[in-house]
Amino acid sequence: MTLSKVPLPAELRAKYAATRPRVLNRTPVFGFGYRSPWQLGNIIQARVAQKYRLNVMLAQQSVREIERTGRSFQDVVDSATLSAHAARLTRPWGADGDHLKTPADIRAAVKAGCTHFTYDVSHELAQGLNAASKKVGAMVRLTRTLKGRRPFTTEISLDETEHTTALEDVLRLLQTWRKQGLPITEIAPRFPGYFEKAIDYYLRIEHGRRIHDTAEFEQYLVGLLEVVRGFGVRICVHSGSDKFSIYPILAKVLHNNVHLKTAGTYYLEELKIIARHDVALFRAIYRFSLAQFQQDRATYELSADLSQLPDVEALDGPALAGLLKSGCGNDHLRQILHVTYGSVLTARCADGQPLFAENMIAVLKRHKADYTREMEQHLLRHIRPFLPA
């Protein structure tokens, strides 16, 4: 018996239009970033997109994410192509090269077939509006040269700064880019409050407690919408995973004029399945993550407190899985596991074999029904406020 050949991503893209990333013109847009290298969750994302008729960036990773996972933009786009084919996705989907900072980043994203380019000028913004504006111009022009006649969309990321982006600055930047003839599709400001990884939005910390007040966020969002309205620009929200308290506000204020980016907590959903069904493996991952945390947290804004961690060694699998649920109140554990994803996924034994990755995928495959159910429910929590009534 001859085994059928598994088609390569490039072969699929050459043959089937639905497996190629495309420009997304309809809104809202959902960024379904997926960090793990084994596609299982990416396929579920594609199925959810098909079922609920979503506009998705099925391929979405930042430069930081691909560096930490040892992948490339091409790997991410190829995973999305294979996932779209496996899920029989017929809706258009996009590929987002996220947080691009250098010409090399842009070239890699263009070569991989990305259709959406997120330019991170947070560093330049700290030097002044002129520096940020100049950097955007250079990046957009390079992308235009490399893409040729192929269409693409653009996004300006201002979110990785210490202070809320002034609405006056947003207006001045958009006016400048319009005068320069630069096609700006989206803008991602630094909003009031905190969009920390793996946990819900909060406004500030008082006496060691997170204050979950959304009034200031909503007021800023209303003002931002007024600023961008005349420019035809979409508003993008970064680090949008598990920010459940603000989804209804985004839907109410922006209607469909929003691009919500999510990524990291799909990895936590996988750890939830592993905790439930292979507690020894989960504990090993936890111990490794704890050892890596101080190093891996360096590029993230976090408020995790190691003194608030549960006794993982004393809890059984179902109890640990319960602690990994979104909004369960154990934010400290979730943040520590969240930001160490790259170290866990790329860890190697002395002989060069994966320390965790192969065992992780084996558990997920053995418990595919449970994994699929949890992932679908998690995705639905993110998209439900934006679905038609």
Provide a role label for each language-model segment:
Residues M1-S79, H85-A87, P103-G128, A132, ...:
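Active-site capping/gating regions of soluble enzymes
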Residues A80-L82, L89-R91, A95-L100:
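Aromatic/His-enriched, Gly/Pro-containing loop or helix-boundary segments
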Residues R91, R150-F152:
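Residues at beta-strand starts and edge strands
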Residues G94, E155, R234:
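Hydrophobic "anchor" residues on beta-strands that sit immediately upstream
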Residues D98, I156, H238:
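Conserved, mostly hydrophobic/aromatic
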Residues T153-E160:
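Short glycine-rich or small-residue beta-strand-to-loop segments that form or flank ligand, phosphate
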